[in-house]
Swiss-Prot record:
This is Aspartoacylase. InterPro entries: AspA/AstE_fam, Aspartoacylase, AstE_AspA_cat, Aste_AspA_hybrid_dom. Keywords: Cytoplasm, Hydrolase, Metal-binding, Nucleus, Zinc. CDD domains: M14_ASPA. Its EC number is 3.5.1.15. It catalyses: an N-acyl-L-aspartate + H2O = a carboxylate + L-aspartate; N-acetyl-L-aspartate + H2O = L-aspartate + acetate. Binds 1 zinc ion per subunit. Disulfide bonds: none annotated. It holds the Pfam family AstE_AspA_cat. Catalyzes the deacetylation of N-acetylaspartic acid (NAA) to produce acetate and L-aspartate. NAA occurs in high concentration in brain and its hydrolysis NAA plays a significant part in the maintenance of intact white matter. In other tissues it acts as a scavenger of NAA from body fluids. SUPFAM superfamilies: Zn-dependent exopeptidases.
Length: 313
């Protein structure tokens, strides 16, 4: 681990997004609460803006209206000429980019926390998009340490061919927060409490950083996406096997080549196959049936961060 020191600009503008998917209710309810009473998210010298990203989907308690808002923040969609013919979420993405971006510009918000729920048994999860970002690795280390002994996992979605174009990607530092298991359209007090604590610790980290605290070199364990796995299908393209009981709810646990992953209605077990141990995430996620994803394979690795402190101190 290197001990090189990195001076970062202080953080000034932070947004907390809820309702990117309108049926993931923890973020929706927290953001609505903070819009009425923002006391617990305020920190000295920091602008923190709670924001409902997909109000139409929230109103209907559905994931989206026309298309997934969390996949359209790419140059092509953000650059499309404004028109009522555009999908609602593309128009909304352009509005959000105007309010909190523009993406890849000096004017964009410093940090966006995007709050999500999953039906998978993933517990507290932080989603990282850049494995070389000292600031975010330090923040995630702080959150993980603060939450202990409650586990908090880091999912690294850096991949050469899987492009996400997430809602939060317009910020200089995008942070995905994913907490589960929670059914769509349902609120659970334990899940809400965990997400609330993750935001509190994240804001405390930013406050400490802005106040001049130096964070020494650190390392975190992350799970990096390898590939997404579809369900077995018949000639008509319909699902022909379901998640095996021994895989269900086993997110983040080691999965070996001989381990069962699918079960047919005839009772046939289908093993993982391949030649390496992987770590499954988003196992049997309800929202991913339409995306043809039964689970994602990840590999476990360690990321190191240099020490950081604010350039003002």
């Amino acid at each position: 681990m290197t001990s090189c020191h990195v001076a970062e600009d202080p953080i000034k503008k932070v947004a907390i997004f809820g309702g990117t998917h309108g049926n993931e209710l923890t973020g929706v309810f927290l953001v609505k609460h903070w819009l009425e009473n923002s006391t617990e998210i305020q920190r000295t010298g920091l602008e923190v803006k709670p924001f409902i990203t997909n109000p139409r989907a929230v109103k209907k308690c559905t994931r989206y209206i026309d298309c997934d808002l969390n996949r359209v923040f790419d140059p092509e969609n953000l650059g499309k000429k404004k028109s009522e013919d555009l999908p609602y979420e593309v128009r909304r993405a352009q509005e959000i980019n105007h309010l909190f971006g523009p993406k890849d510009s000096e004017d964009s918000y410093d940090i966006i926390f995007d709050l999500h729920n999953t039906t998978s048994n993933m517990g507290c999860t932080l989603i990282l998009e850049d494995s070389r970002n000292d600031f975010l690795i330090q923040m995630f280390h702080y959150i993980k340490t603060s939450l202990a002994p409650l586990p908090c996992y880091v999912y690294l979605i850096e991949h050469p061919s899987l492009k996400y174009a997430t809602t939060r990607s317009i910020a200089k530092y995008p942070v995905g927060i994913e907490v589960g298991p929670q059914p769509q359209g349902v609120l659970r007090a334990d899940i809400l409490d965990q997400m609330r604590k993750m935001i509190q610790h994240a804001l405390d980290f930013i406050h400490n950083f802005n106040e001049g605290k130096e964070f020494p070199p650190c390392a975190i364990e992350v799970y990096k996406i390898m590939r997404k796995v579809d369900y077995p299908r018949n000639e008509s393209g319909e699902i022909s096997a379901i998640i095996h009981p021994k895989l269900q709810d086993q997110d983040w646990k080691p999965l070996h080549p001989e381990d069962p992953v699918f079960l047919t209605l005839d009772g046939k077990t289908i093993p993982l196959g391949g030649d390496q141990t992987v770590y499954p995430v988003f196992v049997n996620e309800a929202a991913y049936y339409e995306k043809k994803e039964a689970f994602a394979k990840t590999t476990k690795l360690t990321l190191n961060a240099n020490s950081i402190r604010s350039s003002l101190h």
